[in-house]
């Protein structure tokens, strides 16, 4: 059987049907499904980064399931249905691409993005009572991403360095403040945490100035570290040893060897 999107919507509705539906699905609500939504989103990202196209197909389906499930919850509460979600996003795509569906012109991607932002700004006029340039930056965003967005918003009104040098200086300053905290006779953990936070925030600003997405950069660094450490583990096992029994100096040598092989 070949399922359509309407068939799929009905499948999810049946899962939520009090008469014969699934007990687990019936117990779920908006809040309980947040972790599922987050997990499925990151699994899509992982499939893309691994260039695992067959798995990407599956993970996109799982992500679609989340969208339809949340829409079903909203339909039950008489807020909106999946068709409304689809209608809204289709209208938005048409509205924000006047250079495709209208008479506006966009010669390159910069102009196209400018058209998008112009339409987005028009939509917001009179729609909400914003009191700050920082309004509507979702607090649920990953912290690195949210930091970059906050900084970008401030940059739009001139609260930003134009040169890269003071950005580097700020990172050094925050690093020194971390060092000062841990050099105290009595270390206050909350103070250390605060200074580490400031250091991370300054580092995100450096990444932004260098046109790097901090979340992507850290994710790739995680993958690189994982790949290299797995190689170290394998090298240790080939020597008939266990990693936890190998001195750090030997592990460092193996690590350096792995790095050389990669480079």
Curated annotation (Swiss-Prot):
Binding site for ATP 1: 170-174, 177, 191-194, 198
Gene3D superfamilies per the UniProt record, alphabetical: MazG-like (1.10.287.1080)
EC nos: 3.6.1.8
Top-level taxon in the UniProt lineage: Bacteria
Gene Ontology MF annotations: ATP binding; ATP diphosphatase activity; metal ion binding; nucleoside triphosphate diphosphatase activity
Self-association and partners: Homodimer.
Matches recorded under InterPro entries: MazG-like_dom (IPR004518), NTP-PPase_MazG-like_C (IPR048011), NTP-PPase_MazG-like_N (IPR048015), NTP_PyrPHydrolase_MazG (IPR011551)
Gene Ontology biological-process annotations: dATP catabolic process; dGTP catabolic process; dTTP catabolic process; dUTP catabolic process; TTP catabolic process; UTP catabolic process
Stored CDD domains: NTP-PPase_MazG_Cterm, NTP-PPase_MazG_Nterm
Organism: Haemophilus influenzae (strain ATCC 51907 / DSM 11121 / KW20 / Rd)
Family as reported in the entry's similarity comment: Belongs to the nucleoside triphosphate pyrophosphohydrolase family.
SUPFAM superfamilies: all-alpha NTP pyrophosphatases
Catalytic activity: ATP + H2O = AMP + diphosphate + H(+)
Protein name, UniProt field: Nucleoside triphosphate pyrophosphohydrolase
Keywords: ATP-binding, Hydrolase, Magnesium, Metal-binding, Nucleotide-binding
Pfam families linked: MazG (PF03819)
Transmembrane spans: none
Binding site for Mg(2+): 174, 177, 195, 198
Function: Involved in the regulation of bacterial cell survival under conditions of nutritional stress. Regulates the MazE-MazF toxin-antitoxin (TA) system that mediates programmed cell death (PCD). This is achieved by lowering the cellular concentration of (p)ppGpp produced by RelA under amino acid starvation, thus protecting the cell from the toxicity of MazF. Reduction of (p)ppGpp can be achieved by direct degradation of (p)ppGpp or by degradation of NTPs, which are substrates for (p)ppGpp synthesis by RelA.
Named cofactor requirement(s): Mg(2+)
Binding of ATP 2, residues: 224-228, 255
């Amino acid at each position: 059987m070949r399922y359509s999107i309407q068939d799929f919507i009905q499948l999810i509705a049946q899962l939520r049907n009090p008469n014969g539906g699934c007990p687990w699905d019936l117990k779920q609500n908006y809040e309980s499904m947040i972790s599922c939504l987050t997990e499925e989103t990151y699994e899509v990202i992982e499939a893309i980064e691994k260039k695992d196209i067959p798995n990407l197909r599956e993970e996109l389906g799982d992500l679609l399931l989340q969208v339809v499930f949340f829409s079903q919850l909203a339909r039950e509460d008489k807020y909106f249905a999946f068709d409304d979600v689809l209608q809204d996003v289709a209208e938005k795509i048409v509205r924000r691409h006047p250079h495709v569906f209208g008479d506006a012109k966009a010669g390159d991607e910069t102009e196209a993005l400018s058209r998008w932002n112009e339409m987005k700004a028009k939509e917001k006029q009179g729609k909400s009572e914003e009191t700050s340039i920082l309004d509507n930056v979702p607090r649920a965003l990953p912290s690195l991403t949210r930091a970059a967005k906050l900084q970008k918003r401030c940059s739009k009104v001139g609260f930003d360095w134009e040169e890269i040098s003071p950005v580097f200086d700020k990172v050094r300053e925050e690093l020194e403040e971390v060092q000062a905290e841990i050099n105290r006779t009595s270390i206050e953990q909350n103070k250390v945490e605060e200074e580490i936070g400031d250091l991370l925030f300054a580092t995100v600003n450096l990444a932004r100035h260098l046109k790097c997405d901090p979340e992507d950069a850290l994710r790739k660094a995680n993958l690189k570290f994982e790949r290299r450490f797995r190689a170290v583990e394998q090298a240790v096992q080939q020597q008939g040893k266990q990693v936890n029994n190998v001195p750090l100096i030997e592990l460092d040598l193996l690590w350096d060897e792995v790095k050389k092989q990669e480079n």
